[in-house]
Amino acid sequence: KAGILWAIGEDRKNSYESFISSRKALTYETRDNIPNYEKRPKPLAYQHPLSPEESLKYTQVPVGWSLKLFASEPQIVNPIGLAWDEGGRLWAAETVDYPNEIKAERKGDDKIKILEDTNGDGRCDKVTVFADGLNIPTSLTFGNGGVYVHHAAETLFLKDTDGDDKADIREVVLRGWGTGDTHAGPSNLRYGLDNEIWGTVGYSSFSNDGNRFGSGVYRFTKDGSSLEFLHQFNNNTWGLGLNNEGDVFGSTANNNPSFFCGIPATILPGRKGLSAKMVASSSTFHPITPNIRQVDVFGGYTAAAGHAFANSDNFPESWRGKRAFVAGPTGNLLGMFDTSRDGAGYKSRNAFQLVASADEWFSPVAAEIGPDGNLWISDWYNFIIQHNPTPNDNRGGYAAKNGKGNAHINPNRDRQHGRIYRLVWDEAPKSKINSLGEASNEELLRALGDSNQFWRITAQRLLVDGKKTEIAKSLRALVGKPGIGAIHALWTLDGLGKLDSDTHRNALLSTNPVLRRNAVRALPLDASGVDLIFQSGVINDPDLTTRLAAFVALAQFPTSEPVKNAVTSLGNDEVNQKDEWLSAALDAAGKKHQAEEFSDLEYQESEENLLGNVNWKVSIHSGNGAQHLRPTKEGIKGGKCLKIESKKPTDTSWGAEVKVKANTRYRLRGKIKTEGIQGGGLGALFNVHELQSPERVKTQALRGKKDWTEVSIDFNSLGRKEIT
């Protein structure tokens, strides 16, 4: 520090020291119930909250950027989700009931609020409660003339019918979201390019009418008549984003901050296979205060949230459409990841952080591009972020209890603060659009080509929901023009039911690979779609991500000899064989159409015992009192073994991280002995932690008293190079 201050010169040093002395000093007190998972000599003290103005003085952004307050308490408290209507007004989900106040009949104290800046000074000056009586709403998005809200166990559709900004209609669109853990439920609602509603869910899962899934990405039609699980992640999912090309990404809250979603799980046999892959180069983050508290993955994205892209011109050119923003609330920061093509898929480089604070309450949980083209940040502003595992004497430093939401009960959780900021680049242009609320058809048509993805999707939504079929001719003309508007014109025609075969064929033959890719994704899954795909040549597209989309389409077409022969022929292509995404999609297509086996694509079984010399570690997911032992004479024939015993209910394990080859078939095998295993849990078993939902990779489970019993499970490592 002294060297830096010397190097910057006397004037800047004086400026720095003046700024530091002007800040309100952080103040602390000693309190109980501060988890100490890091096993510091003593738990951290409780920092008192700061005003928004003082908090900003402890928060860093890059040179050339400004963090500007839009709203704060009492205007908004505990903001968990952000969305904007066609008028450019911010809507926020506010939840003081999170995480444990699950109310009877789900009538709670939470709200959907509209926050407006009516005088153009950049600050909220009008707050309207659109809907109240909610209980832990986690996300919202617009469609069908109203707003969709995740309100587990339901997804609601709310609509104002008389123009007073109050919800007059409240309908249930979906039922079945799990409520066993409130931070693992549904979130991240988005209006998709395909005119359906997309979202994510964690391990609380969805289950209704035989449709069960969890920890990943799904979509549903606006009326809720169809719900599809599309991309399997490996744990609690709380991030979703679309780049300008329509490719899908996400993040999970367990050290996996950037996933690419390459293949829909609907085409994979038994929904098992490579549908999504963690592509981040590193999950490490870099707080600017040592006083961070985490439950696991110390120093990394253990609570990653969001994956919005810099999809506007309000960012440096090298960022646009490529850089994603991922929140890390346990590190008091907002991180960045640079995505780039990697074969048919993507890779994602950890690009450090964009915002970081030494205020220990600063807790960004959502970051989205707003109608002004800038990055808006939802600051939960809370000293306690951790949900679970529940602290116990050995892990966390004291014995806590879980509440109804499966979060540890903690009197230090705050229900009085919340902030929403805008991050503004000094060189950002002013938005060309302020509102599409009263826009004409011509204005909506022009907005399909706006530089801000928000306005493009909003215009598309309004045209489709408004059934504006009278502009189909203009939309077809736009598909034939260069620029990003062609993609949205294509999907608008599709949503209106006006995408004719000639327009579709021309899009498939376009010189723009992104338009070709989206045209493939819009193909009808019938004989007409088969004709279009074979007329276009996209199954051999030089753009490998577009080729991947074509292979996915092949796997969804009805079986026919032309399709079967094409899949067999494509399997002999060396490029297709070597690319993990292309080979996985072809493998799914081959199984669907019973095409000839691709010898070069068959998985090679490993004969080596990868568990012979590993570092076994203890994990306690819930419950207290378990002992983890390494007896030397209680194993088979008096040998060594690993042992867990507990007098109380617990979810715990011995685990080891193992390096594996991607797309390789393995067998997990061992022997288990049990005594007195009872209760409502699964029992004693082996499993692969990253492959546990919707159908867990797990062995037979033993309960009661059983002598040494061999159990095993065969599985595929998919795109993973390390498993637990």
Model-derived regions, located:
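Hydrophobic alpha-helix feature that most strongly marks membrane-spanning transmembrane helices
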Residues: 312, 329, 338-342, 359, ...
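Core helices of alpha-solenoid repeat scaffolds
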Residues: 441, 472, 500-501, 531, ...
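Structural detector for internal amphipathic alpha-helices that build alpha-solenoid repeat scaffolds
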Residues: 431-434, 454-467, 484-498, 503-509, ...
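HEAT/HEAT-like alpha-solenoid repeats
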Residues: 442-449, 476-480, 504-509, 534-540, ...
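Extracellular and organelle-lumenal recognition/adhesion modules and their flexible linkers in secreted
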Residues: 596-724
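Beta-propeller domains with acidic blade repeats across secreted/periplasmic ectodomains
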Residues: 1-444, 455-458, 462-464
